[in-house]
Swiss-Prot record:
Subunit structure: Homodecamer; each decamer is made up of two conformers of VP2, called VP2A and VP2B. Interacts with a VP1-VP3 complex. Interacts with the intermediate capsid protein VP6. Interacts with NSP5. Interacts (via N-terminus) with NSP2.
Record family assignment: Belongs to the rotavirus VP2 family.
Function, as annotated: Inner capsid protein that self-assembles to form an icosahedral capsid with a T=2 symmetry, which consists of 120 copies of VP2, with channels at each of its five-fold vertices. This capsid constitutes the innermost concentric layer of the viral mature particle. It encapsidates the polymerase VP1, the capping enzyme VP3 and the genomic dsRNA, thereby defining the core.
Keywords of this entry: Capsid protein, Inner capsid protein, RNA-binding, T=2 icosahedral capsid protein, Virion
Subcellular compartments: Virion
Coiled-coil portions: none
One annotated GO molecular function: RNA binding
Organism: Rotavirus C (isolate RVC/Human/United Kingdom/Bristol/1989) (RV-C)
Protein name: Inner capsid protein VP2
Gene Ontology CC entries for this record: T=2 icosahedral viral capsid; viral inner capsid; viral nucleocapsid
InterPro entries in the cross-refs: Rotavirus_VP2 (IPR007779)
Length: 884
């Protein structure tokens, strides 16, 4: 109601604005007319005056009128724009709700192109988890000194928000590695000049150069370090065709990059590799000639596409996902189906048909009414619909008017070439029942068929047993038994039309059936209507040759484009269907000419690369989520992370709307993913991270190895690179309790007993902590209350220790310094010291082949020429369009 009232108010405001504009215009037009009359009188009275002045006045009046019209137009446009912008959301909602033709095809195309753009990756730097950071040193009283020291720190040292844990930190760290894991490493391409090299040497990448510059500019860097930096340079071996580049890396980063260098995904590239990428069927197609002019040297490399077949089985049990995928395939395929050209003129064809029939006035009127929807656009729509629906294995439905016998005859042709398994069951039954009760049974003098709901057999299967006419019964038998063939080409299942349909011979059966049907008596129909139906059927049978050519054209374009499909084709019913008007089928049959159209080579390779990119991304995301499931299971996060993992996987496939997928399908997807083995590289990377888990924990500024609890306040200790802090790195003389044992047993008596005996204890285990530099918080000793709730609620996950730092950079530091206070605390963070950065021990020599060149988008090196469309031949060696 609110939206309606708002709409009414806006409409009333707009009407009032328009009325005001009209009154203003009328007044100004009247004034202009009066002024024109006065000017005319002046001109007539002063006939001997200057004529040029009168012309200038009239020109000025015309200019004023034009300006006035422009102003009015601008005002109207502005008001229209304001109305549209104010109600834009409401307009979109109404369009989406009530207009069936509203779709998001442009959005699907955009997402498919995003996959294409993300497939080509370039790597300019090495993979890194750590970076050296400069840290200032502090005096024993907490004052900053000019001295500095360098430590290794994590590049991405962030814990997940909310109910976080260290295990989730390692899972997010592993996911970061999976996202940035390189397919290949070309050291020669990413190498940069060492600005301090004495011999114009190079180092491995820009990040190493940044570290050198920061280290060199540090005034505390000693001379022997600067001399060492000037000696860093690459080494080339001409005998082995390799180059070694110095890289400044943390030991874990060095291990990861060495692994990536040894397990690159690139392969040698030759013209043979490119030729093998072309589908065999296209390569041997006589209508296309492929030339590869580029010559590739022995150092050429490429990343092969990841074309493993569907390991999940989206067609089996994932109705929502399968529907989205097939619709995206349908939208994508329609872009590459050629447009029909030089069709017969629609108006001319309708006139010729009416003249040929020579019917009475009432019959001609009925005919023209039935033929009114024939157009070239509708014919093109039907052509793309038939090919696109089979390419994408979409379920189809035909919309028709039962009394329109021309449409029903067109539907008969569609069922002649399209198996019943691709039709929506309800649409198929309605269409067959209309054909039987409107054409077949009245022609043969049989009673109307009464089809019962829930009948397993189709109307055609029931009619086949009752029809005695041989030609009609053979056609019904063909429709009832027609199925797509399944052909396996290079491990991919493709749907294929039968040989009779591919050669167009099936149209002879269709034509014979039409002739037999038109020669029947139609005893129950009036004479005029009977003659109209008979001549319409004869009109279609007269175009047998053109319809046969049309069939060959459809099959050739489909078969050629289907060679570019790289995923198995499964004909499974979809939730939504693609719909076609029967009038469009009539347009296609009546307007088809002898002009042959075949897919352009650029369209073929665009369609091929689009399918390759989708399947490659699909397999990559499967490997990622399987590795993530394995990592979550190993880190004991399996239960709480599962649904989120699967949802993120679906969203990364671009064309699926993850929130709209029912939960039962998501859990079924989880079960399928659990049974897929982990890819080798991803498993090895996880092993490397877990083997260095302690080292990563020490480097992190968010994770400590435990916490010290004491009933008696203890003074803060002095650490050289921090100042005064409550951090200990030695467990001697302290009682140690394992946090994991407390979580398993739930026995908190050891903590309470130790605190009551005034014995400091260390709860050992990796836990997150926060840092606080406020002096007031330390002096108030509020940290004791943090652990009271832990013992009370018996929940160790609430353990969040605070690391206090007090130095000259802290707030209120001079409050402590001037009053000579000694800050104390009852808790201390147990944390190992971070690894100190030493450039002499952090330089690794990475070796790579010297002159590798990686090529992307290999299809651009293929030059394709085609024969003239009129000379194009089908797979039987004959021309596609034989009636030329």
């Amino acid at each position: 109601m609110i939206s309606r009232n708002r709409r009414r108010n806006n409409q009333q405001k707009n009407i009032e604005k328009e009325k005001q504009l009209e009154t203003i215009i009328n007044k100004e037009v009247k004034e202009n007319k009066d002024s024109m009359k006065e000017d005319k009188l002046v001109v007539t009275e002063e006939s001997n005056g200057d004529v040029t002045t009168a012309k200038e006045q009239s020109n000025n009046i015309n200019l004023q009128k034009n300006d006035l019209v422009k102003e009015v137009m601008n005002i109207q446009n502005q008001t229209l724009n304001t109305v549209v912008t104010e109600n834009k959301v409401e307009i979109e909602e109404i369009v989406k709700k009530y207009i069936p033709s509203y779709n998001t095809d442009s959005l699907i195309v955009k997402k498919l192109t995003e996959i294409q753009e993300s497939s080509a990756k370039t790597y300019n730097t090495l993979f890194r988890l750590f970076t050296p950071v400069k840290s200032y040193l502090y005096d024993i009283n907490g004052e900053k000194k000019l001295s500095t020291r360098w430590y290794w720190k994590l590049l991405k040292d962030d814990l997940p928000a909310g109910d976080y844990s260290v295990r989730q930190f390692f899972l997010s760290l592993y996911l970061n590695v999976l996202e940035e894991m390189p397919d290949y490493i070309m050291l020669r391409d990413m190498a940069v000049d060492n600005p301090y090299s004495a011999e114009a040497g190079k180092i491995v990448d820009g990040k190493s150069k940044e570290i050198l510059i920061e280290l060199y500019q540090d005034q505390m860097t000693e001379g022997y370090i600067r001399r060492y930096m000037s000696e860093l340079r690459h080494k080339i071996s001409g005998e082995t065709n390799t180059a070694k580049y110095p890289a400044i890396l943390h030991p874990v980063d060095n291990e990861l990059n060495q692994y990536f260098l040894e397990h690159q995904l690139i392969q040698p590239l030759t013209t043979r590799n490119i030729a093998e990428l072309i589908p065999t069927q296209l390569y041997h197609d006589p209508n296309y000639v492929f030339n590869i002019d580029a010559a590739f040297l022995t150092n050429s490399r490429f990343v092969p596409p990841y074309l493993t077949q569907d390991r999940i089985g989206l067609h089996d049990g994932f109705e929502s996902i399968w529907d989205s995928k097939t619709h995206a395939d349908y939208v994508s395929a329609r872009r590459f189906i050629p447009d029909l050209t030089e069709l017969v003129d629609a108006e001319k064809q309708i006139k010729e048909m009416a003249a040929h029939l020579q019917l009475e006035a009432i019959t001609v009127q009925v005919e023209s009414q039935f033929l009114a929807g024939i157009s070239a656009a509708a014919a093109n729509e039907a052509f793309k619909f038939i090919i696109g629906s089979v390419l994408s294995t979409r379920t189809i439905a035909v919309e028709f008017i039962t009394s329109n016998y021309m449409s029903l005859a067109s539907c008969m042709y569609l069922m002649t070439i399209m198996p019943s398994e691709i039709f929506l069951r309800e649409s198929l039954v309605a269409m067959q029942l209309a054909i039987i009760n409107t054409l077949i049974y009245p022609a043969l003098g049989l009673a109307q068929m009464h089809y019962q709901a829930g009948e397993v057999r189709t109307p055609f299967e029931l009619a086949e047993m009752q029809v005695a006419n041989r030609s009609i019964r053979q056609w019904l038998h063909h429709c009832n038994t027609l199925q797509f063939g399944r052909q396996i080409t290079e491990g991919i299942i493709h749907l294929r039309f039968t040989n009779d349909i591919m050669t167009g011979r099936i149209v002879n059966l269709f034509s014979t059936m039409l002739v037999a049907l038109s020669s029947q008596p139609f005893a129950t129909y009036p004479l005029d209507y009977k003659r109209s139906v008979q001549r319409a059927l004869q009109l279609l049978s007269n175009r047998t040759a053109q319809i046969a050519d049309l069939t060959r054209l459809i099959v050739y374009n489909y078969t050629t484009l289907s060679a570019c499909i790289v995923m198995n084709m499964h004909l499974v019913g979809t939730l939504t269907v693609e719909r076609i008007q029967a009038t469009s089928l009539t347009s296609l049959m009546m307007l088809i000419s002898n002009k042959t159209v075949i897919p352009e080579p650029s369209s073929l390779f665009s369609y091929f690369s689009s399918n390759i990119n989708f399947l490659t991304n699909y397999n990559e995301q499967i490997d990622n989520v399987v590795a993530e499931i394995m990592a979550a299971y190993r880190l004991n996060l399996y239960q709480q992370k599962m649904l989120m993992l699967v949802t993120r996987f679906v969203s990364k496939l671009y064309i699926f709307d993850a929130p709209k997928i029912p939960p039962d399908q998501m859990y079924r997807l989880r079960n399928r993913l659990r049974n897929i083995p982990v890819e080798r590289r991803r498993a090895d990377v996880f092993r490397i991270i877990m083997n260095n888990r302690d080292l990563i924990e020490k480097t992190s500024e968010r994770i400590c190895q435990g916490v010290l609890l004491s009933y008696t306040p203890m003074p803060l200790t002095y650490v050289e690179d921090v100042g005064l802090t409550n951090v200990i790195n030695d467990t001697n003389s302290f009682q140690i309790i394992n946090i994991e044992e407390i979580e398993k047993t739930g026995d908190y008596s050891a903590i309470t007993n130790a605190l009551l005996r005034d014995t400091p204890i260390i709860l050992k285990g990796a836990i997150p902590y926060v840092t606080n530099s406020s002096v007031i918080d330390v002096l108030s000793k509020v940290d004791t209350t943090v652990f009271a709730s832990i013992v009370k609620d018996r929940d160790i996950s609430k353990l969040k220790p605070i690391k206090f730092i007090i130095n000259s950079d802290s707030s209120e530091y001079y409050l402590v310094h001037n009053n000579k206070w000694t800050p104390t605390t009852t808790t201390a963070v147990y944390k190992a010291r971070s690894q100190q950065f030493d450039i002499q021990h952090s330089v690794s020599m990475l070796e790579s082949n010297l002159f590798f060149v990686v090529y992307n988008d290999l299809f651009k090196y293929i030059k394709t020429t085609t024969v003239l469309p009129i000379n194009a031949v089908s797979y039987d060696g004959a021309r596609i369009m034989q009636e030329t």
